[in-house]
Amino acid sequence: MADPNLSPLWTSQEAAKATDGQALGTWAINGVSIDTRSLKPGDLFVALKDVRDGHEFVANAFAAGAEAALVSRDVLGGHPGLMVHDVLHGLEKLGLAARERNSGVISAVTGSVGKTSVKEMLARIFRAAGRAHWSDKSFNNHWGVPLTLARMPRETERAIFEIGMNTPGEIAP
């Protein structure tokens, strides 16, 4: 459940501006999800293409309580959404905008071994010191980092990210 003391995570206008997308309807979301099984009511469902195409799950997302969906083709069935050319690129832009709007201390852990353990230790310390945000699980790849950024409340005072890479140049500034 969203903290009532926090602003909405994203409004339709903010998300459209951040992604250069087209907002369909007026909405405000409290979370961002890529999985209908863990989606919470009020979330933005991001229809990423991976082994399966997330567009196939948009109807399930709305049935689970999604407030809107980030899509690249109209599968919204009249529900609110955000239309972009490429969903992953839209998520990346949302993550960049979240970083730009935040003035808190942002840290990252990289390396070959121990990233998750160090990130969890630092997250525990940060939580004790105020409003903190951190990577869920080991979401440290090309979609996990922008997802974690896009989920970061604007009121975050300290954040810790886990960043991994598979190929040279994959980690962007």
Give the location of each predicted region.
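N-terminal leader/targeting and accessory segments in enzymes
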Residues: M1-K93, A97
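Phosphate-binding loop of NTP-binding sites
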Residues: E14, L91-P173
